[in-house]
Regions:
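N-terminal lobe/hinge region of extracytoplasmic solute-binding protein
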Residues: 48-96, 129, 202
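Ligand-site clamp/hinge motif
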Residues: 223-267
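Structural transition elements
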Residues: 323-359, 376-378
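Periplasmic-binding protein-like
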Residues: 270, 292, 296-335, 380, ...
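Extracytoplasmic/peripheral linker and loop segments enriched in polar/acidic and small residues
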Residues: 397-400, 404-406, 435-501, 526
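Long beta-strand-rich cores associated with HINT superfamily self-processing modules
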Residues: 497-526
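Surface-exposed binding/hinge segments that line
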Residues: 95, 99, 142-186
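Gly/Pro-rich hinge or "lid" segments in bacterial periplasmic/extracellular proteins
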Residues: 175-230, 235
Length: 526
């Protein structure tokens, strides 16, 4: 096992449902049940997911369900463990150079694509050549010091990554979050920036895609050529059920085998039929402040908003029990190896909030707050935030809507439609991976942050190879981001997966951030 830290997607997410797309009604659900194999089939595992992926293109997908689908069809060079370490997948071994300027990867031999063709270094080179192109939409991790990482073919089963400058985070950035695609299938594709590739997927993962019906389901069948061994379960259905309440009912009725549930749902489940698996995703749920909005350009106003909030109330109301959440104060999750609590915590102080508003010369401050209206936790928190800010004399209008639409708007340069927004991210352990959230021009910088101090600290820490010096830089960075008051970390909430007891080896399949299962092929039907 290689003791690297996994850098997960720079995902703009909302609550428990990272993707909120198609809004199917009862007719849609009936169609899904009749057209796709359902739970109870002794050869099919059915998992309820909360929406369609924003992209099924493995080159640029970065949302929960897009990555879940990708992880079933394709394979990366290494895979992530629940504790953030990684082990080899398509890689046989990985050799970082002593000077930190290159990384040699020896590939597994005798791996076949699902169509029977050989997997080789040509496929790896082809994949990274597409991934590194910024126009394709997910290249941030493959650029160091504003220069792209290069990849070279050494021989049929060896590739070499060449860095423009040493980077402490290079291994995490190179080795993760990229799924290898077959050159012989996609070599004639001219545009990899699209959300759906024109060719039928051919992969090295445990399953092959049979059918995708938007808003209803994905169906998969076992990949007979899977290098990890033929999956125990022949068929998998991902059934799209947007409502968590509807998914819970489907689980109780045996219409699906697994679903994500809320803490408040657990007491409703029959533990003789259903088992519950809470596990950490190192996810930060937060309140974001849009610094481009006129009302929030003054840092004192932003700080006033944060002092008016009470995160203990927000978490108790939404998650009920500390068994299901931890309370963060940094932009890093509480168990991150670089996290420090030596930052401004913005302990609740309504009077301090009023003083800051007075110093800023602001009266009658009115803001709006965007949140995912289909997410129960966010709906609860949005209402409480409105009440808490009112106590400091700040009026808040709630703007509930579709999560994907909200973050599509926030991603627009200089967007000012929303002042405040609820969101979340899962990024991994190396703080450099968080740069896309906070650096000027970052691909997921929904806060519209434009701080020279923050940019410089990210840049310095990325190339600092001395562990103690790097840790000190990240301490300074956490304080700088807190001082800017662009993000109010609220919660590190656990994901709670409820599974019908007819499904076995759940923990052996690996419960991990974003993807749910590290390797779904290890699941069994009892």
């Amino acid at each position: 096992m290689i003791n690297w830290k996994k850098g997960l997607a720079s995902v703009a997410v909302v609550g428990l449902g990272f993707v909120l797309a198609a809004c199917g009604g009862s007719n849609t659900e009936e169609t899904a049940t009749s057209s796709a194999a359902g739970a109870g089939d002794d050869a099919t595992f059915t998992y309820a997911i909360s929406g369609d992926p924003s992209s099924t293109n493995p080159i640029n997908t970065s949302d929960r369900w897009g990555l879940t689908v990708t992880n079933m069809i394709y394979s990366p060079l290494v895979t992530v463990e629940a504790d953030g370490t990684t082990q080899n997948a398509l890689a046989e071994s990985v050799e970082p150079a002593e000077d930190g300027l290159s990384l040699t990867v020896h590939l597994k031999q005798d791996v076949k694509w699902s169509d029977g063709e050989d997997f080789t270094a040509d496929d790896v080179v082809f994949t990274y050549e597409q991934k590194v192109k910024k126009e394709n939409g997910n290249a941030d991790s493959l650029w160091v010091d504003d220069q792209p990482i290069a990849i070279e073919k050494v021989d049929k089963y060896t590739v070499k990554f060449v860095l423009p400058t040493p980077s402490a985070a290079a291994i995490s950035n190179i080795a993760t979050e990229t799924y290898i695609i077959p050159e012989h299938i996609f070599k004639d594709v001219s545009d990899f920036s699209v959300s759906e590739l024109p060719e039928k997927p051919v992969g090295t993962g445990p399953y092959q895609l049979k059918e995708y019906k938007r808003g209803e389901y994905f169906t998969f069948e076992a990949n007979e050529n899977y290098y990890g061994g033929k999956p125990s379960i022949q068929n998998v259905t991902l059934r799209i059920i947007e409502s968590t309440d509807t998914a819970k009912v489907a689980l109780q009725k045996g219409e699906v085998d697994a679903a994500v549930v809320l803490p408040s749902d657990i007491e409703d489940l029959d533990d003789t039929q259903i088992s519950v698996y809470p596990y950490t995703e190192n996810r930060i749920g937060y309140l974001g402040l849009n610094t481009h909005s006129d009302a929030l350009q003054d840092v004192k106003v932003r700080q006033a908003v944060l002092f008016a909030l009470n995160k203990d109330e927000l978490n108790q109301a939404a998650y009920l029990d500390e068994d299901y959440y931890a309370t963060p104060y940094s932009f890093l999750p509480p168990n991150n190896p670089y996290v420090t609590e030596d930052v401004e915590k913005y302990e609740t102080n309504a009077e301090k909030a009023k003083e800051l508003l007075q110093e800023a010369g602001v009266t009658d401050l009115s803001l709006n707050l965007a949140f995912n209206s289909t997410d129960p936790a966010q709906t609860i928190q949005a209402t409480l935030i409105q009440q808490q800010l009112q106590q400091a004399g700040i009026t808040v209008t709630l703007e509930g809507g579709d999560g994907t639409a909200i973050f599509t708007e926030l991603k627009k340069p200089d967007s000012t439609k929303y002042n405040l927004f609820l969101g979340g991210y899962i990024m991994g352990n190396d703080p450099d991976l968080y740069g896309s959230l906070f650096e000027t021009g970052g691909s997921a910088n929904y806060f519209q942050s434009n701080s020279e101090t923050i940019d410089n600290l990210f840049a310095q820490a990325a190339v600092e190879l001395d562990t103690d010096k790097r840790e000190a830089l990240y301490d300074d960075l956490q304080q700088a981001i807190a001082d800017e008051a662009i993000i109010y970390p609220i919660v590190d909430n656990k994901k709670i997966l409820a599974v019908n007891n007819r499904i076995g080896n759940v923990e052996d399949a690996g419960l991990i951030p974003i993807y749910t299962f590290e390797d779904m092929s290890k699941l069994t039907i009892k």
